[in-house]
Regions:
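Carbohydrate transferase catalytic cores enriched for Leloir-type hexosyltransferases
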Residues: 1-389
Length: 389
């Protein structure tokens, strides 16, 4: 089977969660299914295309369309405009689209749906993203897909209950984590990476883009109450790119009585993340809603105790290997921080949760993601072929 995959997300200047998924899925698919040919499609200006990673597998071919994405967008929207497969040297059997992106095709395709945050919490989505979804026609492309790849049971449930997508059309393809990169064992380079950010003692870590949905305000408020109530004098380290509507967050930090202990590192290279996870006493992630929650899984793989939300997909990821809280109740954050740093019993709890988290994270790897994806393609393309006989 010749499988075309849209890898335009890999041309972003900074790797996003969708980019991490796309990169690892392609790599795992090529290794798992050498009998299939994978044709990767990307578009953009020459400088943009240079950001693409190198894929070494012999069953991978990359098609680079040297055309600005805005121009491609307009071409695809034109009545009678080109189909994406017209830019490929050979006609594929099926497409995989790893996100809601503008495309036009006459071929069967599988669409990965990460979450429905834009519909469930529209107040947490930028106007630009809402406009993008409108132009893409997210309902229509979902309806017309041969199959839907949902990254969690939670996302699958949202698709069924909110959009009426038939259960038989949905396959659960959970994301994975690189067990070689994200592991509990301290690495020789860890201290040097942490020293880059002047992190020479334990800390509380929160890693997320600064945007409303990530609920970092509750991290700040919870930390301040925790410290005011006599909690351990651990600094709070915030890692993540600037998003949007950060004014309230910045104001909370500036007003905090403990602002000198709140460190904003901004965006950091991916290769530094494992060292920062491993140096943390606890990882805090009280997001309001997640389709999956990859940073939580990464922290777990590094053996870090996790405090996260008892909402959406996060209980699926964490199970009993972390502390689940109500993201709408800041006192839950405070209570969990006290529980996990408590002088007498906290150390035992951290050791227990860290070991459980590391063990549970082993259930999530990119090979499993690829296996579930291939199974979905085989099942639904076979069903379609039989139906056409």
């Amino acid at each position: 089977m010749r499988i075309a995959i849209d890898i335009r997300s890999l041309t972003d200047e900074r790797m996003t969660g969708v980019g991490v998924y796309t990169l690892n899925l392609v790599t795992a698919l090529a290794e798992l299914a050498p009998q299939h040919e994978f044709v990767l499609f990307a578009s953009g200006s020459r400088g943009v295309l240079e950001r693409l990673p190198n894929f070494k597998a012999s069953n991978i071919k990359i098609v680079r369309l040297n055309l600005p994405n805005r121009l491609l967008f307009l071409l695809l929207k034109l009545p009678g405009g080109p189909k994406l497969e017209s830019f490929l040297p050979e006609r594929p059997d099926v497409w995989i689209f790893p996100k809601f992106n503008l495309f036009k095709t006459a071929l069967p395709y599988f669409l990965t749906v990460h979450d429905l945050a834009f519909e469930i919490f529209p107040q947490f989505v930028t106007f630009k993203e809402q406009l993008h979804n409108l132009l893409v026609g997210v309902h229509q492309v979902t309806d017309q897909a041969q199959g839907i790849l949902a990254v969690s049971e939670s996302t699958a449930a949202d698709l069924r209950t909110r959009w009426g997508v038939e259960a038989d059309k949905i396959s659960i393809t959970p994301l994975g984590v690189d067990g070689q990169l994200f592991q509990a064992r301290e690495q020789p380079s860890d201290k040097a990476y942490r020293a880059t950010y002047d992190l020479n003692r334990p800390y509380i870590l929160a890693l997320a883009t600064q945007e409303p949905r990530k609920n970092l305000e509750s991290v700040i408020e919870g930390y301040e109450l925790f410290r005011a109530q006599g909690g351990e004098t651990l600094p709070l380290v915030l890692v993540g790119a600037q998003g949007w509507k950060t004014g309230a967050l910045k104001e909370l930090i500036e007003r905090s009585a403990f602002k000198n202990d709140i460190l904003e590192l901004g965006y950091i290279p991916d290769k530094h993340k494992p060292a920062l996870y491993r140096g943390a006493t606890v990882f805090v992630w009280p997001s309001f809603y997640e389709g999956f929650g990859l940073p939580v899984l990464e922290a777990m793989a590094c053996g870090v105790p996790v405090i996260t939300s008892a909402t959406s997909s996060l209980p699926e990821i964490v199970g009993t290997a972390g502390l689940l809280i109500d993201p709408f109740n800041v006192n839950d954050v405070v209570s969990a921080l006290h529980q996990i740093t408590e002088p007498q019993r906290g150390a035992d709890l951290r050791k227990q949760l860290g070991a459980q988290a590391s063990m549970r994270a082993q259930n999530f790897n990119w090979r499993h993601t690829a296996q579930a994806t291939i199974a979905a393609l085989n099942k639904l393309t076979s069903t379609s072929s039989n139906g056409n006989k």
